[in-house]
């Protein structure tokens, strides 16, 4: 798969409110693939760029269910099928004794799923990211706010998107090479 030579167009803003307003306007204009970078969390920004965070809880739920089932079935197999021991006349399949390990396996698998699911869904580890090619982007961790429209967006047009971002009155606009 050939990479697009341009990753997107990035606009730099002076304040968090200007970034939120620009993100709102950009999203309302029909751009779907946008992202924002700021030196601190900005309230309301995630909603304005159309961020939805519903994948990780589902991954954790599936991991927890798999962990609980595997813990329970492992104990059932060992005590009732593989090596049945009649101890004090108790049944081989004594489910109350299985609760603790089943619970622990549920928590273990859910926790591992949360960590690896978050890493996978965030595309990590990522030692290289195209936004680092923009010289002014180093200010994103200090005092500047950036909004990028990705070239993979359906509405993206190099000239039209640049003109649209210029109308938002940013401090500067940069093309982000891949």
Over which residues does each language-model region extend?
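Cytosol/matrix-facing juxtamembrane amphipathic
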Residues: 2-36, 43, 84-100, 107-178
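Generic detector of intrinsically disordered, low-complexity, polar/charged segments
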Residues: 5, 41, 47, 60-64, ...
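Cytosolic juxtamembrane regions of integral membrane proteins
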Residues: 35-57
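Short, structured active-site "lid" loops
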Residues: 51-75
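Alpha-helical transmembrane segments
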Residues: 59-62, 102, 106
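Hydrophobic alpha-helical transmembrane segments of multipass integral membrane proteins
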Residues: 65-68, 72, 105-115
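Membrane-helix interface motif
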Residues: 75-84
């Amino acid at each position: 798969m050939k990479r697009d030579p341009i990753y997107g167009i990035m606009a730099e803003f002076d304040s968090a409110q200007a970034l939120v307003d620009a993100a709102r306007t950009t999203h309302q204009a029909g751009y779907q693939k946008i992202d924002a970078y700021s030196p601190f969390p900005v309230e309301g920004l995630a909603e304005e760029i159309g961020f939805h965070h519903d994948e990780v809880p589902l991954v954790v739920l599936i991991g927890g269910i798999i962990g609980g089932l595997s813990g329970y079935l492992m104990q059932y197999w060992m005590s009732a099928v593989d090596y049945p021991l009649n101890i004090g006349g108790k049944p081989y399949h004594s489910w109350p004794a299985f609760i603790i390990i089943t619970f622990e396996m549920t928590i273990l698998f859910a926790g591992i799923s949360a960590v690896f699911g978050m890493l996978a869904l965030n595309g990590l580890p990522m030692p290289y990211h195209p936004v680092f090619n923009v010289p002014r982007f180093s200010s994103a961790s200090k005092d500047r706010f950036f909004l990028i429209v990705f070239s993979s967006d359906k509405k993206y047009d190099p000239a039209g998107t640049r003109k649209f971002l210029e109308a938002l009155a940013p401090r500067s606009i940069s093309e982000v090479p891949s």
